[in-house]
């Protein structure tokens, strides 16, 4: 077996993910070399993600290295990986998912419910911003809204900005905070009923060249089937809504057992950018009706998971989310036009 060249971003969190992946593959008896690749998102740390334009600001250069044969395997934070398949590449597996929840981090307040009107709340996510504005509107209908500000940089940088007083609180992913050893900074978890998490949050994704059977054969050994089916459902939902990584869309799927039956459950919602309107849906897909039934082949389960996601998206559209999808697409087109316009003299 050849040495597997594993591509990753150079950030501390990405290196944690790559090191974990390398160690897991080494336990299978493989030789692995980590290759650091700087992406657009890394080189433009001070710009808001929504202003960087195209999808894949944290993945495009890594995928390019895969296609060029410079690496054999890429490890992504799955929430950063565009849902549209890249020609010549294949998403082949996800290991067991970490905590999917968002956390509230503050030096002054115990929970997001304690934030007063006008408080400065930092997040890099349009989804979190929309949900925070919705939550604030419900809590303080007659008071000034929170000042929800963009915050860029790695986890350590964001925590320093909080400690320096630039923000009263920030929202981060529990998985990243914990992986880097800062789990004790979380003051409380955000409830899924108000802050449904991002598609793929807490999960890693392994991507290879689709014709690299040798690498695929080894990497799929790291696949955690419940996680894999869950993220396939979530990504199918996002793909049908054409939302992209920055859209105010939340989704959380999980494989559950109920009285011997095996099911995939999916909660999903889409919001306007200002959080004033939202649509939600909950749905189930049966994988096995009872414990005595023959287990379905993985390929069939994958198809059912993706069908669940696309059907949930159709439900949201039927409920009235078409206008929000159009708003998202319009906003994306306007950003693309601004970025492609020649600089003014």
Placement of each model-derived feature along the sequence:
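Short, structured active-site "lid" loops
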Residues: 46-73
